[in-house]
Amino acid sequence: MEHLLAQLRAAAEPTRLRLLALCARGALCVTDLCDVLGQSQPRLSRHLKLLVEAGLLERVPEGANAYFQVPAEATLVRQLLARLPEQDAALAADRRQAARIAAERARAASEAFRRDGADWDELRALGLPAGEIEAAIAALLPAQIGRLVDIGTGTGRLLELLADRTGAALGLDASRDMLALARARLAERGIAGHCAVRQADMYRLPLADSSQDVATLQMVLHYAEEPAAAIAEAARVLRPDGMLLVIDLAPHSLAELAARHAHRWAGFDDSAIGEWLLGAGCALREARTIPGRIAVRLWAAQRLPVPVRSPEPALEL
């Protein structure tokens, strides 16, 4: 009872309710919150500290910055916010200001990538058929996903694609520039309430064992020094019978990809992927190919409750 009372006391203040309402719509840093609410950083920092201590918000460090968001398990926050009137003048003004900031951030991030010449959309940069690849991903994944982690999320495009099918989606990436663009795009599209991004190393995911229903590795492994370790770490966070979907290049002979795009691997065949999946406690269930100048391969695997001794053959479509 005392924990519940402490949470109610923490929420029972106008500024803190406004903070909860904002952070429930997507992760925001202190600077963003100061811009929206028009209050000083020391004042808001005290409010945020109380909300974090009560478990109503979580603080996610990212470099020298930190973002605040409502934890997935904080059902009390959502129950409280559901009772707030949508037409409340202060809350409506906060939403408009937050939307304006999100649009500005998305525009600034996109312009920065274009100015620097960064190939932030790898499917486009390599001339790959993004529409066909996304359709294959959508077909392979369950209709209702539950909890999803997208490892190497980049611009967050996969989170956008699957937003309507997942209860909670988390995109992880090592690049703060990519995360800035992804975070702004998710907020601009109004899906940041249940789709979040976070800085992380693919070999050390900030997630508990068996905590996710689906994990995706899209166009990530060809950059990895240790693809087997990346697959094993993705499998670690999956529940038994959870799904791991790997999307990457099939074997190719385009040496320029190593020089121009820093690829470490010239694609992967079924034998290598199947062996790595098996070593991670997963069984390959299905594989698909998207043909093109560079073929793209999709491998759908299931996390096994017990280890197996030999991989099962993939169903070729």
Task: Give the ranges of each region predicted by the language model.
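C-terminal alpha-helical "lid/dimerization" subdomain adjacent to the S-adenosyl-L-methionine
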Residues: 243-299
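Class I SAM-dependent methyltransferase SAM/SAH-binding core
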Residues: 147-149, 155-204
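A short acidic, Gly/Pro-enriched loop at the edge of an enzyme's catalytic core
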Residues: 203-215
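Beta-hairpin "wing" of winged helix-turn-helix
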Residues: 53-62, 69
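N-terminal helix-turn-helix DNA-binding core of bacterial DNA-binding proteins
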Residues: 2-42, 65-73, 136
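A short glycine-rich, Lys/Arg-flanked "PGG" loop and its adjoining helix->strand segment in the class I
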Residues: 228-243
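Conserved alpha-helix/loop element of class I SAM-dependent methyltransferases that forms part
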Residues: 127-146
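Amphipathic alpha-helical dimerization/coiled-coil segments
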Residues: 73-124
